């Protein structure tokens, strides 16, 4: 832990994002960063310091640009910002120190995911795809040569990482994927495509799942995971997608046309990709659950102060009982979600990884985040409905978490089937 704090305390350069243009005439006090009571959250002193350090950096360097990133669907300083995150030691937060990582646990990973998402939901999603879906998969499943080759640059921020699992006709039914990998000598030839890939347009390194045995029964036994590098012959990306939310977190289709991938880039073993995939999904759901937490906190950061500045009928609208009820509902949804996520993260750090609870935390937090965002819009009234204010962005970003990393419906199936299995 001491190593992590040292890494997180590295000097950050003086680069600063330019503040976004002022919205409509809004009272200065209509937005503030509300304090988070981490005594209630059960964090130790080092975890509290982690939140403080990363939050201060993000509120100064990312939050002022979040609205512009959303409006333009572009983060112009992404590469430079990524190196800043690398300097803070958070891109490889669960990776061993020997590869440049911070050697921390999943609770710390959730905390960073939460605070980045609080500043910008889109950048938070890109962070999760890089640090968990790519870096953590290589940490958990890569051999020594792969770790030494890829992790240092991913962790420093020189490289951006991604994971490619979904296809146009293989989302929730991921084992029906059609991307084919044929062994030819010392390499594999990949043909097919992947879709909805977060960080796809920007990624230098991607963990890609493909079928090496199309006749395997069950089909899951024929899946193999590969490490693919940008620039490998036959690999290309299509134009980035124009999304409802998470704008600026670039997403695209990946195209493989006789793409040659060295056999040395097989992650784990041939036809063992489903184990890499499924074990990774549990931790993906856990870490990404930090995203809805951050969005909910951002809604409160904007809504609570607004209710105590805006006046109607001769008093602050936060004094009306209906608005007090809204504040209570938003706060308790956030706190209940936070406790569930943090406790599951602590259990995972102790080696107690339960799929139904990894599915449960993102199911509950995601649906709460959507409702909290809706409540925030209602509290701001007409201002909540115009794009000069960030409330619409919070709603659009929150909705992604009911769809990505397995839909809410699939998460309910995971939980229900777990209980059914207990009674076989």
Curated annotation (Swiss-Prot):
Q: Which residues form a coiled coil?
A: none
Q: Which residues carry this modification: N6-succinyllysine?
A: 56, 65, 76, 260, 316
Q: Which Pfam families did the record assign?
A: Acyl-CoA_dh_1, Acyl-CoA_dh_M, Acyl-CoA_dh_N
Here the transit peptide covers 1-30
In which family does this protein belong, per the annotation?
Belongs to the acyl-CoA dehydrogenase family.
How does this protein assemble?
Homotetramer.
Q: Does the keyword Oxidoreductase apply?
A: yes
Is Acetylation among this UniProt entry's keywords? yes
Residues reported in the UniProt entry to bind FAD: 163-172, 196-198, 310, 321, 378-382, 407-409
The name this protein goes by in its record:
Isovaleryl-CoA dehydrogenase, mitochondrial
Q: How is it modified after translation?
A: Acetylation of Lys-76 is observed in liver mitochondria from fasted mice but not from fed mice.
Q: What organism is recorded for this protein?
A: Mus musculus (Mouse)
Q: Tell me a GO cellular component.
A: mitochondrion
Q: Tell me which positions the record assigns to the signal sequence.
A: none
Q: Do you know which InterPro entries this protein is assigned to?
A: Acyl-CoA_DH_CS (IPR006089), Acyl-CoA_Oxase/DH_mid-dom (IPR006091), Acyl-CoA_Oxase/DH_mid-dom_sf (IPR046373), AcylCo_DH-like_C (IPR036250), AcylCo_DH/oxidase_C (IPR009075), AcylCoA_DH/ox_N (IPR013786), AcylCoA_DH/ox_N_sf (IPR037069), AcylCoA_DH/oxidase_NM_dom_sf (IPR009100)
Q: Which reaction does it catalyse?
A: 3-methylbutanoyl-CoA + oxidized [electron-transfer flavoprotein] + H(+) = 3-methylbut-2-enoyl-CoA + reduced [electron-transfer flavoprotein]; pentanoyl-CoA + oxidized [electron-transfer flavoprotein] + H(+) = (2E)-pentenoyl-CoA + reduced [electron-transfer flavoprotein]; hexanoyl-CoA + oxidized [electron-transfer flavoprotein] + H(+) = (2E)-hexenoyl-CoA + reduced [electron-transfer flavoprotein]; butanoyl-CoA + oxidized [electron-transfer flavoprotein] + H(+) = (2E)-butenoyl-CoA + reduced [electron-transfer flavoprotein]
Q: Where is the active site?
A: 284 (proton acceptor)
UniProt entry keywords in alphabetical sequence? Acetylation, FAD, Flavoprotein, Mitochondrion, Oxidoreductase, Transit peptide
